[in-house]
Amino acid sequence: MSETGAKRRMDRFDPSIEPKWREFWAREGIFKAGRRAGAPRRYILEMFPYPSGDLHIGHLKNYVIGDALTRYYVIRGYDVLHPFGWDAFGLPAENAAIKYGRHPREWTYSNIAESKKSLEIAGIMYDWSREVTTCNPDYYRWNQWLFLLLYRKGLAYRAKATVNWDPVDQTVLANEQVDAEGRSWRSGAKVEKRELEQWFFRITAYAERLLNDLDKLDRWPENVKTMQRNWIGRSEGAEVTFLALPPGADLYAPPPPDAEPLVVFTTRPDTLWGATFMVLAPEHPLAPKLTAPERRAEVEAYIARARMESEIERTSATREKSGVFLGSYAINPVNDERIPIWIADYVLMGYGTGAIMAVPAHDQRDFEFARQFGLPVRVVVQPPGETLDGDTMTEAWPGDGVMVNSGPINGIPVGKGEGQSVKAAIAWLEAQGKGKGTVTYRLRDWLISRQRYWGTPIPMLHLPDGTIKPVPEDQLPVLLPEVQDYLPKGKSPLAAAEHWVNTIDPETGQPARRDTDTMDTFVDSSWYFLRFCDAQNDREIFSREAARQWMPVDQYIGGVEHAILHLLYARFITKVLYDEGLVPEDEPFKALFTQGMVQRRVRTPLDIVAPGMVRFPEELRRKLELPAEAQTVDQARALLKERGYTLEEESDGGLTAVSGPVTMSKSAGNGIPVGPFVRQYGSDVARIVVLFAAPPENSMEWTDEGVAGAQRFLNRIVALFGPDRDEIAAMVRSGNGAAPEGEDRALYRKLHETIRKVTLDTEQFRFNTAIAALMELLNEASRYRAEVGRVTPVFAQTAATFARLLSPFAPHLAEEVHSWCGGTGSVYDAGWPEWDESALVLDEVEIVLQVNGKLRGKIMAPAGADEEQLREWALTNPRVLSFVGDKTVRKVIVVPGKLVNVVV
């Protein structure tokens, strides 16, 4: 067979070409940062993962998006930093290790090796020389350094607090790690409340900056910024100090010396004169002291119940109000009235001060509570044109009006502006020394202590006299010791490692005990992007020069689920480091892209027990609460339909229950391992499916049809350009740059339209439409090649340019086509094509013909036709003439290049 004949049989994409190109990229360092000295820089980063072992296709989307963008900027001549690492400490690794009976370290490093293999076979190219693993001492040493920095600045502190306790994982959780239903972010267990000594980072000191600087992030999704604004939760109002009298105090006598100040934050200080009782959160530290002896049993039982409830349950608007009177009273500072003090679960310790002054006439929750327990309702705002009566009101009035029964602010209109009630009340409180205007936040300090083994040891020493001091910096890292028993027991497993816990204070030589808690894994991820700038530095966390060179991250890519966890913490730590002069800007990520998920239907075969009779498998029965008894096929179909499933018949006669699209995961059983898929189909096929199926911010469904479509596209590229590769290469080398004429003109125009569209779409993350444009160009090139019957300069130019345009999306085939076109070296050194604006000018344009503004026909006309020519063609057009008839033409409106409207 002749060589030409052999080449003509090249009609499909062969995935076996991929390994040689991956080896080539690694050998040549194509994607190593610093390769192009002096070139403009880009830092592109995907959120690093927990090492969970062999990756499935669902994991790939995040990385494929980042890789496509990286390849685009590399071929454009940028010096790109695209690093990778492993978020290896924390509960996910430890729980999995416990489940499989392996040490967390062994499990973690084994999974890192497997995951890395999957990424490499998928053709995701990183600068592996900057790889970080957070459980390595050379990384967590700097976690400890960061802790000591915050400690010196007064931003790390230890305090007793009511904390979220996960009874399954046996550890505390930050507020951000408890979902809206009061469940743990990892175990799903109902979170309990406990009083414990814990370490905190004072993120609230940065609350105002974290809030205001969201306005600078104009390339972040609005929904992420809104979530952070709501979580920070800024409120303006006043702090007012009530005086809580001890139980049994004489209500008519002056307050005794042991009366307790009770600080309240309110956004409506103008309604203080309407307060008829006070409510404390069940966790309030003064609640036990203010409880009368005869009420103690009831109060303690109520507090115990409240600790078991989630915040969303406690604050539900539809829930019947509950509470207990403590048996003590407080003095309202604006009128010296004695009002009863209650505890109720609708007041949260985590917001404001954990105490409220209740104004039932003007707050619906307080109103419902007052009606439930027969407490007085006093009106202090009268709405326009109405007269409210506290005894007959059926709901609170929270709206506008005029202040009444309010002493010095009577008659003032309600509002927060100048001359309105809120500012007037604050001015009066400050003048009287009874309160002050203030701002408060929903945001609470970041609780970083964890009572688990697999984490960064906290570098603090506990001395015999009860004091706590930091480990000197030159003693870092405090190494995580090897222990035999790392199962959770409610206190850190490190506490049992006596050989490690008992140490010597290096500064005094006195005995000391190490802190036995470990750090929240979100500390590890709060600064890892900075370590990538200088990952091999063993003298400092990173150099200022490296940070100036690369920071901030130009494009960050990851899931929206991290909006109020990782992303908020990373912004906080970056601001702290900026204040220390270590980083050039106080925001870590210029642009954020949140990708959608990869979904796939779950298919579960049913057991056929007799002709026309089936039984649901046990796992499906449990999951969907289906009957155990055998069902007819129609009964089974109906039961599945009620649960959002369909029943499909297989080619072998079997029956399968098919779910709707479900996020791909190991637990759902619908993951496709990366390795076997890539070996069979090629990573370029996987990449095209992921990038083409839907806009990347949306979730996409992985289907067999999508895989087949991606294969067809790549096969057509091979079939079109492969057989002619020698002729194409020769013509590209000859460099015929003459402007195309005649039949070549349409392909040349389509080529430059495609360059423009792929360029703009790639920069806007519209990968699906960029690939669609390449498919259109392929169609046009195929039509042209069939009609012309030979390789021409414009066809050769199209092939060479196509390889470069394809390179972000199907990089292995792009390199192959580039080599067919005579390219030496990598396609990523060939440069991104520029479009020719003059090529986009059409020879002919479509002109719409109208009569009295209604469409009556269309004609093709030369692009430069003047008004007179267009007018003449319109007035002689048979379709136009048939609608004009014998009517007089009053005027002709011509819009060159677009339309002619004949008015009769």
UniProtKB/Swiss-Prot annotation:
Biological process (GO), any one: leucyl-tRNA aminoacylation
Motif 'KMSKS' region: positions: 663-667
Extent of motif 'HIGH' region: 49-59
PROSITE patterns: AA_TRNA_LIGASE_I
Positions bound to ATP: 666
Keyword field contains ATP-binding: yes
SUPFAM superfamilies for this protein: Anticodon-binding domain of a subclass of class I aminoacyl-tRNA synthetases, Nucleotidylyl transferase, ValRS/IleRS/LeuRS editing domain
Compartment(s): Cytoplasm
Swiss-Prot/TrEMBL catalytic activity: tRNA(Leu) + L-leucine + ATP = L-leucyl-tRNA(Leu) + AMP + diphosphate
Top EC class, one word: ligase
Domain of life: Bacteria
GO function terms (MF aspect): aminoacyl-tRNA deacylase activity; ATP binding; leucine-tRNA ligase activity
A single Gene Ontology CC term: cytosol
E.C. number(s) listed in UniProt: 6.1.1.4
Key words of the record: Aminoacyl-tRNA synthetase, ATP-binding, Cytoplasm, Ligase, Nucleotide-binding, Protein biosynthesis
PANTHER family: LEUCINE--TRNA LIGASE, MITOCHONDRIAL, LEUCYL-TRNA SYNTHETASE
Family the UniProt entry places it in: Belongs to the class-I aminoacyl-tRNA synthetase family.
Record NCBIfam families: leuS_bact (TIGR00396)
Record protein name field: Leucine--tRNA ligase
